[in-house]
């Protein structure tokens, strides 16, 4: 299903906390508009390239009941896909070139940041955070080489909670090569700049300035219809934010704040 009812710009302009002035001043938005137009909307052969694999990560103690419930929705909507929950034991056997850096990380969620890039680089497929609920299958996006989702657009931020990729995509190779620091001092900014959203966004644009084939960063409606900014408000029906094109709903557990 190709969603053509609204343009990329229309979707982001209707997003929570949209800032027209910031959007107009950032050349990154023009790049995202172009990727969406050329790699998603344009008629093309849509044969599968991304492997039918779903990867999730849970390190440490047993995952909460809600996470188990959300995880089941991914298997339910993708009955023919391979599903893998990566635990501490699995990570022991994963090929991690810079294992010393991984072992030095003290925040469990930041370890997960580190691992998702290596897992997708080696195996391909779709990585999904454990607090995501699947609303519809992702099969019709597998013709792409790489996809991710945009956050709530003041500045361009690409979120890392849901990423699809072929193995050894240039973006992932660039990330793994340049991920040389991973410190957590209690500041989310430090984490975001070394392994998280800000780091990922920087690496993404460094690559797509040259390599644009099959790459799309989808508007928030696709994977993040429920805004992080309103998750703490009382009596909010998060499902009321879901759109016809929404493939997933992020419940924003923000578990990294509590897991060090």
Where are the language model's segments positioned?
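Glycosyltransferase-associated regions of secretory-pathway enzymes
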Residues: 1-112, 130-260
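Small-residue hinge/turn detector
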Residues: 113-125
């Amino acid at each position: 299903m190709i969603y053509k009812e609204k343009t990329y710009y229309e979707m982001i302009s209707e997003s929570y906390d949209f800032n027209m002035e910031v959007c107009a001043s950032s050349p990154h938005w023009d790049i995202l508009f172009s990727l969406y137009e050329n790699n998603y909307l344009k008629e093309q052969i849509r044969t599968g390239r991304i492997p039918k694999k779903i990867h999730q990560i849970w390190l440490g103690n047993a995952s909460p009941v809600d996470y188990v419930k959300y995880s089941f929705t991914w298997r339910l909507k993708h009955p023919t896909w391979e599903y893998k929950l990566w635990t501490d034991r699995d990570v022991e056997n994963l090929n991690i070139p810079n294992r010393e850096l991984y072992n030095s990380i003290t925040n469990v969620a930041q370890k997960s940041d580190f691992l998702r890039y290596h897992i997708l680089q080696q195996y391909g497929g779709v990585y999904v955070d454990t607090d995501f609920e699947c609303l519809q299958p992702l099969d019709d996006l597998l013709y792409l080489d790489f996809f991710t989702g945009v956050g709530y657009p003041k500045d361009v931020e690409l979120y890392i909670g849901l990423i699809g990729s072929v193995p050894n995509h240039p973006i992932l190779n660039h990330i793994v090569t340049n991920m040389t620091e991973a410190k957590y001092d209690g500041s989310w900014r430090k984490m975001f700049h070394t392994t998280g959203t800000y780091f990922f966004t920087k690496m993404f644009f460094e690559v797509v300035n040259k390599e644009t084939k099959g790459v799309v960063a989808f508007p928030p409606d696709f994977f993040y219809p429920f805004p992080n900014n309103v998750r703490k408000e009382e009596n909010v029906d998060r499902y009321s934010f879901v759109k016809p094109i929404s493939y997933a709903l992020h419940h924003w557990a923000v578990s990294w704040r509590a897991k060090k």
